[in-house]
Amino acid sequence: MQAILSSWFVQGMIKATSDMWLKGWDERNGGNVSLRLTAEDVTPYESDFSPQPRHEALSQPMPELADCWFIVTGSGKFFRNVQLDPADSLVVLQVDSDGKGYRIFWGLTNGGLPTSELASHFQSHIVRMGVTHGRDRVIMHCHATNLIALSYVLELNTATFTRELWEGSTECLVVFPDGVGIVPWMVPGTDSIGDATSEQMKRHSLVLWPFHGIFGTGPTLDEAFGLIDTAEKSAEVMVKVRSMGGKKQTISTEELIALGKRFGVTPLEAALRV
């Protein structure tokens, strides 16, 4: 048997959370990450599992995730400290066979629970499992500074926000041709915001929480991080453009269409019409 601290998924979570903190996206205990695992992923590390795994109930049944394994950041844990004490900052859990609760097999050595946004993560995992036929395994939430800033000055609709980011950096249309979904401002840590986010996840791999942060998804931690990083870089460009007096020229609709054709992606039609 191998030590779970050396596993690819624990090491991956350490790197992702450290990178997110270094980017300035996750102050204090802000942000949360979940990675869906397979039984094959976790089996080599069973010797590190708790002999009496703690059981917790879910706020609502999620039978679609029955028996699924996850590694998740802990509630109240600081991303800057994950690398110092991953066994306290992270948690490996398995959803019950009836989807009504979960058991904690490893992590949270000083007590606590998984992220307070667990419902939002699980609801989005369910949607993305269906949309991508199981390919997407990561849900990532952070407080990306410039995306939050733009939520104060742009119209809060998908077409407008997406178009602004597409124009901010040429690669954006290629990386997220499906655009950015947007939910209204809502109280975090609730089933309601999870419902609204997962509804947007049916059509978008990025979902903005105005005045709060961003949700991203992908098949790997690197892909989800890179998706958010790309959108945030474009948002930073557009914040600077606005501070310099606004656009004098930009990427045209015809050029965006040509870009999509070159890279074999289908741009969100509503954003092309803005």
Swiss-Prot record:
Matching SUPFAM superfamilies: AraD/HMP-PK domain-like
Gene Ontology MF term list: metal ion binding; rhamnulose-1-phosphate aldolase activity
Location in the cell: Cytoplasm
One example of a Gene Ontology biological process annotation: pentose catabolic process
Active site: 117
Family: Belongs to the aldolase class II family. RhaD subfamily.
Cofactor: Zn(2+)
Reaction(s) catalysed (UniProt annotation): L-rhamnulose 1-phosphate = (S)-lactaldehyde + dihydroxyacetone phosphate
Domain of life: Bacteria
Gene Ontology CC entries for this record: cytosol
Known role: Catalyzes the reversible cleavage of L-rhamnulose-1-phosphate to dihydroxyacetone phosphate (DHAP) and L-lactaldehyde.
Cofactor note: Binds 1 zinc ion per subunit.
Protein name stated in the entry: Rhamnulose-1-phosphate aldolase
Recorded name of the encoding gene: rhaD
UniProt-annotated binding residues for Zn(2+): 141, 143, 212
HAMAP family, per database record: RhaD
Main location: cytoplasm
Keywords for the protein's UniProt record, in alphabetical order: Cytoplasm, Lyase, Metal-binding, Rhamnose metabolism, Zinc
The EC number(s) this enzyme carries: 4.1.2.19
Pathway in which this enzyme or protein is active: Carbohydrate degradation; L-rhamnose degradation; glycerone phosphate from L-rhamnose: step 3/3
Description of how the protein assembles with itself and partners: Homotetramer.
Signal peptide range in chain numbering: none
